[in-house]
Amino acid sequence: RRVHGDRRQRRNLPMNYVILGLSGLVAVILVSNVVDRSNKPVLPRVITPFPSSKLLNLPLFKDDHEESLYWGTYRPHAYLGIRARTPKSLLAGLMWSGIKDGTVSLRHHCQDSDGLSKYGWVSHNGRDFGRQVLIDKDLSLITSFMKYKSQGSGYGGDWAVRIEGKDDKDEGNESMSKFQHLFFYLAEEDSNASLQIDGLDLSESSLLASGSRENVGSWQMHLHSEESLNVHYVGFRTRHFHNLTDLVQQHLAIQVRRRHIFEVSNTVHKMSNVLVFQISGRLPFTVDLSFISGVTMSEVSERVNSLSGSSLSSRLLDKEKEFDAKFEKCFGLKNKVDSDSVLVGKASISNMLGGIGYFFGQSKVSTSKPKGDDDIIDYWPAELYTAVPSRAFFPRGFLWDEGFHQLLIWRWDVHIALDAIGHWLDLMNVDGWIPREQILGSEALSKVPEEFVVQYPTNANPPTLFLVIQDILNGIQKNKFSPAEIHKIDNFLDSAYIRLRHWFQWFNTTQTGEFVQNYSLAAVFYIFRLLYQLHMLNV
Protein backbone atom coordinates (compact mmCIF):
# COMPACT_ATOMS: atom_id res chain seq x y z
CA ARG A 1 0.00 0.00 0.00
CA ARG A 2 2.81 2.38 0.86
CA VAL A 3 4.41 1.64 -2.50
CA HIS A 4 1.16 2.35 -4.33
CA GLY A 5 0.64 5.52 -2.28
CA ASP A 6 4.09 6.79 -3.24
CA ARG A 7 3.30 6.13 -6.86
CA ARG A 8 0.07 8.10 -6.61
CA GLN A 9 1.93 10.99 -5.02
CA ARG A 10 4.53 10.93 -7.79
CA ARG A 11 1.77 10.84 -10.41
CA ASN A 12 0.13 13.90 -8.84
CA LEU A 13 3.35 15.93 -8.75
CA PRO A 14 3.05 17.23 -12.36
CA MET A 15 -0.55 18.27 -11.73
CA ASN A 16 0.51 20.02 -8.55
CA TYR A 17 3.13 21.94 -10.49
CA VAL A 18 0.52 22.91 -13.10
CA ILE A 19 -1.88 24.14 -10.42
CA LEU A 20 0.92 26.02 -8.70
CA GLY A 21 2.01 27.58 -11.99
CA LEU A 22 -1.52 28.64 -12.92
CA SER A 23 -2.01 30.13 -9.47
CA GLY A 24 1.17 32.13 -9.92
CA LEU A 25 0.08 33.30 -13.36
CA VAL A 26 -3.30 34.44 -12.02
CA ALA A 27 -1.52 36.32 -9.25
CA VAL A 28 0.77 38.04 -11.74
CA ILE A 29 -2.20 39.06 -13.90
CA LEU A 30 -4.08 40.42 -10.89
CA VAL A 31 -1.07 42.36 -9.70
CA SER A 32 -0.37 43.72 -13.18
CA ASN A 33 -3.98 44.85 -13.50
CA VAL A 34 -3.74 46.65 -10.18
CA VAL A 35 -0.50 48.30 -11.29
CA ASP A 36 -2.02 49.27 -14.65
CA ARG A 37 -5.06 50.77 -12.96
CA SER A 38 -2.88 52.81 -10.69
CA ASN A 39 -1.00 54.31 -13.62
CA LYS A 40 -3.48 54.55 -16.46
CA PRO A 41 -6.82 53.06 -17.51
CA VAL A 42 -6.65 49.63 -19.11
CA LEU A 43 -7.92 49.70 -22.70
CA PRO A 44 -10.30 47.00 -23.92
CA ARG A 45 -8.25 44.38 -25.74
CA VAL A 46 -10.01 45.02 -29.02
CA ILE A 47 -8.57 48.57 -29.18
CA THR A 48 -5.17 47.78 -27.67
CA PRO A 49 -2.43 48.00 -30.33
CA PHE A 50 -0.10 45.07 -30.90
CA PRO A 51 2.90 45.60 -28.56
CA SER A 52 5.64 45.84 -31.16
CA SER A 53 7.43 48.66 -32.96
CA LYS A 54 5.44 50.04 -35.88
CA LEU A 55 6.64 48.94 -39.28
CA LEU A 56 6.18 52.47 -40.59
CA ASN A 57 8.97 53.59 -38.26
CA LEU A 58 11.49 51.50 -40.19
CA PRO A 59 14.26 53.57 -41.85
CA LEU A 60 13.26 52.30 -45.31
CA PHE A 61 9.97 54.23 -45.01
CA LYS A 62 11.58 57.50 -43.90
CA ASP A 63 13.59 60.33 -45.48
CA ASP A 64 13.59 60.28 -49.32
CA HIS A 65 10.97 57.53 -49.59
CA GLU A 66 8.51 59.34 -47.33
CA GLU A 67 9.00 62.71 -49.00
CA SER A 68 8.77 61.27 -52.52
CA LEU A 69 5.25 59.99 -51.76
CA TYR A 70 4.07 63.05 -49.83
CA TRP A 71 1.72 64.55 -52.46
CA GLY A 72 -0.40 62.39 -54.71
CA THR A 73 -3.79 61.60 -56.20
CA TYR A 74 -4.69 60.06 -52.86
CA ARG A 75 -8.45 60.80 -52.94
CA PRO A 76 -9.56 58.03 -55.34
CA HIS A 77 -13.27 58.60 -54.71
CA ALA A 78 -12.98 61.93 -56.56
CA TYR A 79 -12.59 62.13 -60.33
CA LEU A 80 -9.49 64.19 -59.57
CA GLY A 81 -8.50 64.55 -55.93
CA ILE A 82 -5.10 65.49 -54.52
CA ARG A 83 -3.86 65.43 -50.94
CA ALA A 84 -0.72 64.77 -48.91
CA ARG A 85 0.09 61.72 -46.81
CA THR A 86 -0.53 63.55 -43.55
CA PRO A 87 -3.59 63.46 -41.24
CA LYS A 88 -4.46 67.14 -41.78
CA SER A 89 -3.77 68.01 -45.41
CA LEU A 90 -4.36 70.70 -47.97
CA LEU A 91 -6.89 69.14 -50.35
CA ALA A 92 -7.34 69.95 -54.02
CA GLY A 93 -9.90 68.70 -56.48
CA LEU A 94 -11.95 69.22 -59.62
CA MET A 95 -15.67 69.60 -60.26
CA TRP A 96 -17.39 70.43 -63.54
CA SER A 97 -20.91 71.15 -64.71
CA GLY A 98 -22.89 68.41 -66.39
CA ILE A 99 -26.47 67.29 -66.94
CA LYS A 100 -28.19 64.82 -64.63
CA ASP A 101 -31.91 63.99 -64.79
CA GLY A 102 -32.42 66.96 -67.09
CA THR A 103 -30.88 69.53 -64.74
CA VAL A 104 -27.41 71.01 -64.26
CA SER A 105 -25.39 68.97 -61.79
CA LEU A 106 -21.80 69.07 -60.59
CA ARG A 107 -19.52 66.10 -61.22
CA HIS A 108 -17.07 65.55 -58.37
CA HIS A 109 -17.14 62.10 -56.79
CA CYS A 110 -17.00 58.98 -58.95
CA GLN A 111 -20.52 57.57 -59.25
CA ASP A 112 -22.33 55.59 -61.91
CA SER A 113 -25.37 57.86 -61.73
CA ASP A 114 -23.33 60.63 -63.41
CA GLY A 115 -23.50 58.58 -66.61
CA LEU A 116 -19.89 59.05 -67.74
CA SER A 117 -19.14 56.66 -70.58
CA LYS A 118 -15.50 56.50 -69.51
CA TYR A 119 -13.18 57.62 -66.73
CA GLY A 120 -9.88 56.23 -65.57
CA TRP A 121 -6.13 56.54 -65.59
CA VAL A 122 -4.40 55.62 -68.83
CA SER A 123 -0.94 56.31 -67.34
CA HIS A 124 0.10 56.49 -63.69
CA ASN A 125 3.42 55.64 -62.08
CA GLY A 126 2.23 55.74 -58.46
CA ARG A 127 4.69 58.47 -57.54
CA ASP A 128 4.88 61.67 -59.54
CA PHE A 129 2.83 61.34 -62.73
CA GLY A 130 -0.61 60.38 -63.97
CA ARG A 131 -2.86 61.02 -66.97
CA GLN A 132 -6.59 60.37 -66.93
CA VAL A 133 -9.35 60.45 -69.56
CA LEU A 134 -12.97 61.31 -68.69
CA ILE A 135 -15.83 61.25 -71.22
CA ASP A 136 -19.04 62.94 -70.04
CA LYS A 137 -21.47 62.81 -72.98
CA ASP A 138 -20.04 65.34 -75.49
CA LEU A 139 -17.44 66.68 -73.06
CA SER A 140 -13.97 65.15 -73.14
CA LEU A 141 -11.58 65.95 -70.29
CA ILE A 142 -7.95 64.90 -69.93
CA THR A 143 -6.41 65.53 -66.52
CA SER A 144 -2.66 65.25 -65.96
CA PHE A 145 -0.84 65.35 -62.62
CA MET A 146 2.88 65.71 -62.08
CA LYS A 147 5.29 66.48 -59.26
CA TYR A 148 8.66 68.15 -59.45
CA LYS A 149 11.22 68.84 -56.72
CA SER A 150 13.33 71.89 -57.50
CA GLN A 151 15.93 73.70 -55.46
CA GLY A 152 14.06 75.75 -52.90
CA SER A 153 10.89 73.64 -52.95
CA GLY A 154 9.21 72.91 -49.65
CA TYR A 155 8.78 69.40 -48.27
CA GLY A 156 7.26 67.13 -50.92
CA GLY A 157 8.13 69.47 -53.78
CA ASP A 158 5.90 71.32 -56.26
CA TRP A 159 3.11 69.87 -58.39
CA ALA A 160 0.97 70.78 -61.36
CA VAL A 161 -2.40 69.81 -62.78
CA ARG A 162 -3.30 70.23 -66.46
CA ILE A 163 -6.96 70.06 -67.50
CA GLU A 164 -7.70 69.79 -71.23
CA GLY A 165 -11.31 70.13 -72.28
CA LYS A 166 -12.89 69.73 -75.69
CA ASP A 167 -16.31 69.25 -77.23
CA ASP A 168 -16.42 65.90 -79.04
CA LYS A 169 -19.21 67.22 -81.29
CA ASP A 170 -17.40 70.45 -82.17
CA GLU A 171 -16.85 70.74 -85.92
CA GLY A 172 -14.55 73.75 -85.77
CA ASN A 173 -17.26 76.42 -85.50
CA GLU A 174 -16.08 78.46 -82.50
CA SER A 175 -19.34 80.40 -82.18
CA MET A 176 -21.25 77.12 -81.78
CA SER A 177 -18.79 75.40 -79.45
CA LYS A 178 -19.90 74.46 -75.97
CA PHE A 179 -19.41 76.83 -73.02
CA GLN A 180 -18.02 74.82 -70.10
CA HIS A 181 -17.59 75.50 -66.38
CA LEU A 182 -14.82 73.91 -64.32
CA PHE A 183 -14.54 74.30 -60.56
CA PHE A 184 -11.08 73.79 -59.06
CA TYR A 185 -10.95 73.98 -55.28
CA LEU A 186 -8.52 74.06 -52.37
CA ALA A 187 -9.57 73.00 -48.86
CA GLU A 188 -7.43 73.21 -45.74
CA GLU A 189 -8.02 70.53 -43.08
CA ASP A 190 -5.45 71.97 -40.67
CA SER A 191 -6.85 74.79 -38.53
CA ASN A 192 -3.30 76.01 -37.86
CA ALA A 193 -2.55 76.51 -41.57
CA SER A 194 -3.57 79.50 -43.67
CA LEU A 195 -5.49 79.76 -46.94
CA GLN A 196 -6.28 83.04 -48.69
CA ILE A 197 -6.96 85.00 -51.88
CA ASP A 198 -4.98 88.21 -52.28
CA GLY A 199 -6.99 90.38 -54.69
CA LEU A 200 -7.44 88.04 -57.65
CA ASP A 201 -6.40 89.84 -60.86
CA LEU A 202 -5.32 87.44 -63.59
CA SER A 203 -4.65 90.29 -66.00
CA GLU A 204 -1.68 91.26 -63.84
CA SER A 205 -0.65 87.97 -62.23
CA SER A 206 -1.26 84.25 -62.47
CA LEU A 207 -1.66 83.99 -58.68
CA LEU A 208 -4.89 82.33 -57.54
CA ALA A 209 -4.30 81.67 -53.85
CA SER A 210 -1.62 81.42 -51.21
CA GLY A 211 -1.10 79.99 -47.76
CA SER A 212 1.34 78.35 -45.43
CA ARG A 213 1.79 74.96 -43.83
CA GLU A 214 4.26 73.88 -41.18
CA ASN A 215 6.31 71.45 -43.27
CA VAL A 216 5.64 72.85 -46.76
CA GLY A 217 6.27 76.46 -45.81
CA SER A 218 4.66 79.32 -47.73
CA TRP A 219 2.94 78.17 -50.90
CA GLN A 220 1.16 79.65 -53.91
CA MET A 221 -1.30 78.32 -56.48
CA HIS A 222 -1.04 79.77 -60.00
CA LEU A 223 -3.23 79.48 -63.10
CA HIS A 224 -2.02 79.63 -66.70
CA SER A 225 -3.98 79.33 -69.95
CA GLU A 226 -3.43 80.45 -73.53
CA GLU A 227 -7.20 80.81 -74.05
CA SER A 228 -9.46 83.64 -72.93
CA LEU A 229 -11.19 82.36 -69.82
CA ASN A 230 -13.41 83.83 -67.13
CA VAL A 231 -12.37 83.13 -63.55
CA HIS A 232 -14.59 83.73 -60.52
CA TYR A 233 -14.13 82.64 -56.93
CA VAL A 234 -15.84 82.07 -53.60
CA GLY A 235 -14.50 81.26 -50.15
CA PHE A 236 -16.34 79.22 -47.51
CA ARG A 237 -15.82 78.34 -43.88
CA THR A 238 -16.92 74.77 -43.13
CA ARG A 239 -16.33 72.09 -40.52
CA HIS A 240 -16.75 69.21 -42.98
CA PHE A 241 -15.06 68.40 -46.28
CA HIS A 242 -17.00 65.33 -47.42
CA ASN A 243 -19.90 67.43 -48.75
CA LEU A 244 -18.09 70.06 -50.83
CA THR A 245 -20.25 69.22 -53.85
CA ASP A 246 -23.41 70.19 -51.97
CA LEU A 247 -21.72 73.33 -50.62
CA VAL A 248 -20.85 74.61 -54.10
CA GLN A 249 -24.10 73.47 -55.72
CA GLN A 250 -26.24 75.18 -53.08
CA HIS A 251 -24.23 78.39 -53.49
CA LEU A 252 -24.74 78.31 -57.27
CA ALA A 253 -28.48 77.73 -56.82
CA ILE A 254 -28.70 80.84 -54.64
CA GLN A 255 -26.77 82.83 -57.25
CA VAL A 256 -29.11 81.70 -60.02
CA ARG A 257 -32.19 82.69 -57.99
CA ARG A 258 -30.80 86.07 -56.95
CA ARG A 259 -28.74 87.15 -59.97
CA HIS A 260 -29.95 84.79 -62.71
CA ILE A 261 -26.38 83.73 -63.57
CA PHE A 262 -24.55 80.43 -63.11
CA GLU A 263 -21.58 82.05 -61.45
CA VAL A 264 -20.01 82.02 -57.96
CA SER A 265 -20.18 85.29 -56.05
CA ASN A 266 -16.58 86.59 -55.92
CA THR A 267 -16.86 86.80 -52.13
CA VAL A 268 -14.65 85.27 -49.46
CA HIS A 269 -15.41 84.44 -45.84
CA LYS A 270 -12.86 86.12 -43.58
CA MET A 271 -11.78 82.75 -42.14
CA SER A 272 -12.20 80.67 -45.30
CA ASN A 273 -10.85 77.13 -45.30
CA VAL A 274 -12.31 76.30 -48.73
CA LEU A 275 -11.61 78.29 -51.89
CA VAL A 276 -13.43 77.47 -55.14
CA PHE A 277 -12.36 78.86 -58.51
CA GLN A 278 -14.87 78.75 -61.35
CA ILE A 279 -13.02 78.61 -64.68
CA SER A 280 -15.33 79.13 -67.66
CA GLY A 281 -14.83 79.36 -71.40
CA ARG A 282 -15.67 77.99 -74.81
CA LEU A 283 -14.20 74.61 -75.64
CA PRO A 284 -11.58 73.60 -76.43
CA PHE A 285 -9.33 75.04 -73.75
CA THR A 286 -6.39 74.00 -71.56
CA VAL A 287 -5.77 75.12 -67.98
CA ASP A 288 -2.53 74.63 -66.03
CA LEU A 289 -2.62 74.92 -62.23
CA SER A 290 0.75 75.03 -60.46
CA PHE A 291 1.36 74.52 -56.75
CA ILE A 292 4.63 76.15 -55.66
CA SER A 293 5.93 75.30 -52.16
CA GLY A 294 8.63 76.87 -50.01
CA VAL A 295 7.99 80.18 -51.75
CA THR A 296 10.57 82.96 -51.95
CA MET A 297 9.47 85.79 -54.18
CA SER A 298 12.65 85.93 -56.27
CA GLU A 299 12.15 82.50 -57.78
CA VAL A 300 8.38 82.10 -58.07
CA SER A 301 8.07 83.22 -61.69
CA GLU A 302 10.72 80.80 -62.92
CA ARG A 303 9.21 77.86 -61.06
CA VAL A 304 5.68 78.67 -62.27
CA ASN A 305 6.92 78.84 -65.86
CA SER A 306 8.60 75.44 -65.49
CA LEU A 307 5.26 73.89 -64.45
CA SER A 308 2.97 75.48 -67.03
CA GLY A 309 2.67 76.04 -70.76
CA SER A 310 5.23 74.48 -73.11
CA SER A 311 7.58 73.54 -70.25
CA LEU A 312 4.86 71.47 -68.59
CA SER A 313 3.99 69.89 -71.96
CA SER A 314 7.60 68.80 -72.34
CA ARG A 315 7.79 67.41 -68.79
CA LEU A 316 4.53 65.49 -69.20
CA LEU A 317 5.74 63.99 -72.48
CA ASP A 318 8.97 62.86 -70.81
CA LYS A 319 7.00 61.27 -67.96
CA GLU A 320 4.77 59.46 -70.45
CA LYS A 321 7.84 58.03 -72.20
CA GLU A 322 9.32 56.95 -68.86
CA PHE A 323 6.05 55.22 -67.99
CA ASP A 324 5.97 53.35 -71.31
CA ALA A 325 9.59 52.23 -70.93
CA LYS A 326 9.07 51.01 -67.37
CA PHE A 327 5.88 49.18 -68.33
CA GLU A 328 7.74 47.22 -71.00
CA LYS A 329 10.63 46.52 -68.63
CA CYS A 330 8.29 45.22 -65.91
CA PHE A 331 5.87 43.18 -68.00
CA GLY A 332 7.47 42.68 -71.43
CA LEU A 333 4.22 42.58 -73.42
CA LYS A 334 5.34 44.32 -76.61
CA ASN A 335 6.27 41.14 -78.48
CA LYS A 336 3.68 38.91 -76.78
CA VAL A 337 0.33 40.61 -77.44
CA ASP A 338 -1.21 43.15 -79.82
CA SER A 339 -1.13 46.91 -79.23
CA ASP A 340 -4.71 47.06 -77.93
CA SER A 341 -3.87 44.48 -75.28
CA VAL A 342 -0.83 46.53 -74.26
CA LEU A 343 -3.12 49.54 -73.77
CA VAL A 344 -5.38 47.42 -71.56
CA GLY A 345 -2.34 46.37 -69.54
CA LYS A 346 -1.22 49.97 -69.11
CA ALA A 347 -4.71 50.99 -68.01
CA SER A 348 -4.79 48.11 -65.51
CA ILE A 349 -1.58 49.03 -63.69
CA SER A 350 -2.40 52.76 -63.97
CA ASN A 351 -5.83 52.40 -62.37
CA MET A 352 -4.36 50.20 -59.65
CA LEU A 353 -1.73 52.85 -58.83
CA GLY A 354 -4.10 55.76 -59.42
CA GLY A 355 -6.57 54.07 -57.08
CA ILE A 356 -4.18 54.26 -54.12
CA GLY A 357 -5.49 56.50 -51.37
CA TYR A 358 -4.37 57.89 -48.04
CA PHE A 359 -6.86 57.85 -45.18
CA PHE A 360 -6.77 58.90 -41.54
CA GLY A 361 -9.33 58.37 -38.81
CA GLN A 362 -10.75 55.86 -36.35
CA SER A 363 -12.65 52.68 -37.17
CA LYS A 364 -15.85 51.90 -35.30
CA VAL A 365 -15.54 48.47 -33.65
CA SER A 366 -17.81 46.36 -31.50
CA THR A 367 -16.75 44.90 -28.17
CA SER A 368 -19.59 42.37 -28.21
CA LYS A 369 -19.55 39.19 -30.25
CA PRO A 370 -23.15 38.85 -31.46
CA LYS A 371 -24.37 41.43 -33.95
CA GLY A 372 -27.35 43.48 -32.88
CA ASP A 373 -26.14 44.00 -29.30
CA ASP A 374 -23.29 46.34 -30.03
CA ASP A 375 -21.11 48.18 -27.58
CA ILE A 376 -19.38 50.39 -30.14
CA ILE A 377 -16.07 52.09 -29.43
CA ASP A 378 -13.41 53.84 -31.50
CA TYR A 379 -10.24 52.10 -32.65
CA TRP A 380 -7.08 54.13 -32.14
CA PRO A 381 -6.42 57.01 -34.61
CA ALA A 382 -4.67 55.44 -37.58
CA GLU A 383 -3.46 56.20 -41.08
CA LEU A 384 -3.76 53.89 -44.05
CA TYR A 385 -2.04 53.99 -47.43
CA THR A 386 -3.81 51.46 -49.60
CA ALA A 387 -5.27 50.69 -53.00
CA VAL A 388 -9.07 50.58 -53.20
CA PRO A 389 -11.27 47.97 -54.92
CA SER A 390 -13.53 50.53 -56.65
CA ARG A 391 -13.33 54.31 -56.89
CA ALA A 392 -17.11 54.57 -57.22
CA PHE A 393 -18.45 51.87 -54.88
CA PHE A 394 -15.66 50.95 -52.45
CA PRO A 395 -13.21 53.87 -52.19
CA ARG A 396 -11.63 52.64 -48.95
CA GLY A 397 -9.36 49.91 -47.67
CA PHE A 398 -10.38 46.24 -47.73
CA LEU A 399 -7.97 43.76 -46.16
CA TRP A 400 -8.91 40.86 -48.43
CA ASP A 401 -8.63 42.89 -51.62
CA GLU A 402 -5.31 44.45 -50.69
CA GLY A 403 -3.43 41.18 -51.04
CA PHE A 404 -4.60 40.88 -54.64
CA HIS A 405 -3.82 44.55 -55.33
CA GLN A 406 -0.25 44.18 -54.12
CA LEU A 407 0.34 41.03 -56.20
CA LEU A 408 0.36 43.41 -59.16
CA ILE A 409 1.81 46.52 -57.53
CA TRP A 410 5.02 44.93 -56.20
CA ARG A 411 6.00 44.03 -59.76
CA TRP A 412 5.87 47.73 -60.58
CA ASP A 413 7.27 49.24 -57.37
CA VAL A 414 8.11 46.99 -54.43
CA HIS A 415 8.69 50.00 -52.17
CA ILE A 416 5.06 51.10 -52.61
CA ALA A 417 3.89 47.53 -51.96
CA LEU A 418 5.88 47.19 -48.73
CA ASP A 419 4.64 50.60 -47.58
CA ALA A 420 1.00 49.56 -48.06
CA ILE A 421 1.53 46.17 -46.37
CA GLY A 422 3.25 47.91 -43.46
CA HIS A 423 0.30 50.27 -43.02
CA TRP A 424 -2.10 47.31 -42.85
CA LEU A 425 -0.02 45.27 -40.40
CA ASP A 426 0.33 48.30 -38.12
CA LEU A 427 -3.46 48.18 -37.68
CA MET A 428 -3.18 44.86 -35.79
CA ASN A 429 -4.46 44.76 -32.22
CA VAL A 430 -2.99 42.84 -29.29
CA ASP A 431 -4.99 39.72 -30.20
CA GLY A 432 -3.74 39.66 -33.79
CA TRP A 433 -6.98 40.97 -35.32
CA ILE A 434 -7.00 43.53 -38.15
CA PRO A 435 -10.35 45.22 -38.94
CA ARG A 436 -11.16 43.94 -42.38
CA GLU A 437 -12.78 47.12 -43.74
CA GLN A 438 -11.13 50.47 -43.02
CA ILE A 439 -13.53 53.42 -42.99
CA LEU A 440 -11.22 56.23 -41.94
CA GLY A 441 -12.21 59.89 -42.10
CA SER A 442 -15.39 61.71 -43.05
CA GLU A 443 -14.91 61.33 -46.82
CA ALA A 444 -14.67 57.53 -46.54
CA LEU A 445 -17.52 57.38 -44.02
CA SER A 446 -19.83 59.35 -46.32
CA LYS A 447 -19.70 56.51 -48.88
CA VAL A 448 -20.70 53.69 -46.48
CA PRO A 449 -24.25 52.71 -45.41
CA GLU A 450 -24.58 52.94 -41.63
CA GLU A 451 -25.21 49.22 -41.16
CA PHE A 452 -21.78 48.37 -42.61
CA VAL A 453 -19.69 50.82 -40.59
CA VAL A 454 -19.10 48.80 -37.41
CA GLN A 455 -16.32 46.19 -37.53
CA TYR A 456 -16.60 42.99 -35.48
CA PRO A 457 -13.50 41.39 -33.90
CA THR A 458 -14.86 37.92 -34.64
CA ASN A 459 -14.92 38.60 -38.39
CA ALA A 460 -11.97 37.93 -40.66
CA ASN A 461 -10.99 38.30 -44.28
CA PRO A 462 -8.81 35.70 -46.01
CA PRO A 463 -5.16 36.58 -45.23
CA THR A 464 -4.19 37.39 -48.82
CA LEU A 465 -1.20 39.46 -47.71
CA PHE A 466 0.58 36.12 -47.22
CA LEU A 467 0.21 35.55 -50.98
CA VAL A 468 2.06 38.80 -51.67
CA ILE A 469 4.88 38.01 -49.27
CA GLN A 470 5.30 34.54 -50.78
CA ASP A 471 5.34 36.09 -54.25
CA ILE A 472 7.99 38.63 -53.23
CA LEU A 473 10.13 35.84 -51.77
CA ASN A 474 9.81 33.98 -55.07
CA GLY A 475 10.83 37.21 -56.81
CA ILE A 476 14.04 37.28 -54.77
CA GLN A 477 14.83 33.73 -55.86
CA LYS A 478 14.21 34.71 -59.49
CA ASN A 479 16.54 37.76 -59.26
CA LYS A 480 13.74 40.28 -59.74
CA PHE A 481 15.32 42.78 -57.35
CA SER A 482 18.54 44.72 -56.99
CA PRO A 483 20.83 44.02 -53.99
CA ALA A 484 19.64 47.29 -52.38
CA GLU A 485 16.00 46.25 -52.79
CA ILE A 486 16.69 42.79 -51.35
CA HIS A 487 18.31 44.41 -48.32
CA LYS A 488 15.21 46.55 -47.71
CA ILE A 489 12.86 43.59 -48.22
CA ASP A 490 14.89 41.53 -45.71
CA ASN A 491 14.74 44.33 -43.15
CA PHE A 492 11.00 44.68 -43.64
CA LEU A 493 10.26 40.95 -43.34
CA ASP A 494 12.55 40.65 -40.33
CA SER A 495 10.46 43.28 -38.52
CA ALA A 496 7.10 42.09 -39.90
CA TYR A 497 7.61 38.45 -38.90
CA ILE A 498 6.30 38.83 -35.33
CA ARG A 499 3.10 40.47 -36.57
CA LEU A 500 2.59 37.93 -39.35
CA ARG A 501 3.05 35.06 -36.89
CA HIS A 502 0.58 36.60 -34.45
CA TRP A 503 -1.90 37.19 -37.27
CA PHE A 504 -1.68 33.53 -38.29
CA GLN A 505 -2.18 32.43 -34.68
CA TRP A 506 -5.29 34.59 -34.45
CA PHE A 507 -6.71 32.96 -37.59
CA ASN A 508 -5.80 29.49 -36.41
CA THR A 509 -7.52 29.92 -33.04
CA THR A 510 -10.57 32.05 -33.88
CA GLN A 511 -11.59 30.95 -37.37
CA THR A 512 -11.76 27.19 -36.85
CA GLY A 513 -14.84 25.44 -38.19
CA GLU A 514 -16.85 22.39 -37.22
CA PHE A 515 -15.43 20.31 -40.04
CA VAL A 516 -11.79 20.02 -41.08
CA GLN A 517 -11.58 19.77 -44.86
CA ASN A 518 -8.52 19.01 -46.94
CA TYR A 519 -8.45 22.52 -48.41
CA SER A 520 -8.50 24.02 -44.88
CA LEU A 521 -5.48 21.94 -43.91
CA ALA A 522 -3.75 22.91 -47.14
CA ALA A 523 -4.25 26.60 -46.37
CA VAL A 524 -2.85 26.18 -42.85
CA PHE A 525 0.18 24.27 -44.12
CA TYR A 526 0.75 26.91 -46.83
CA ILE A 527 0.91 29.75 -44.29
CA PHE A 528 2.91 27.62 -41.85
CA ARG A 529 5.48 26.93 -44.57
CA LEU A 530 5.68 30.64 -45.41
CA LEU A 531 6.16 31.55 -41.74
CA TYR A 532 8.91 28.93 -41.54
CA GLN A 533 10.64 30.58 -44.52
CA LEU A 534 10.40 33.96 -42.81
CA HIS A 535 11.67 32.46 -39.57
CA MET A 536 14.70 31.04 -41.37
CA LEU A 537 15.36 34.48 -42.87
CA ASN A 538 15.34 35.92 -39.36
CA VAL A 539 17.72 33.22 -38.14
Regions from the language model: what does each represent?
Residues 68, 93, 118, 156, ...:
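Intrinsically disordered regions, especially transient/low-confidence alpha-helical propensity segments
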Residues 392-538:
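Aromatic-rich carbohydrate-recognition surfaces in CAZymes
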Residues 255-274, 377-383, 485-489, 539:
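Intrinsically disordered, low-complexity acidic Ser/Thr-rich regulatory segments
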Residues 151-155, 168-176, 365-377, 447-448, ...:
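Intrinsically disordered, low-complexity coil segments
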Residues 15, 289, 371-372, 500, ...:
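Generic low-polarity alpha-helical segments
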Residues 304-394, 423, 514:
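Low-complexity, Ser/Thr/Pro/Gly-enriched N-terminal "stalk/linker" regions
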Residues 1-346, 353:
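Terminal accessory carbohydrate-recognition/targeting modules of carbohydrate-active enzymes
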Residues 267, 330, 372, 376, ...:
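A generic structural signal for ordered alpha-helices
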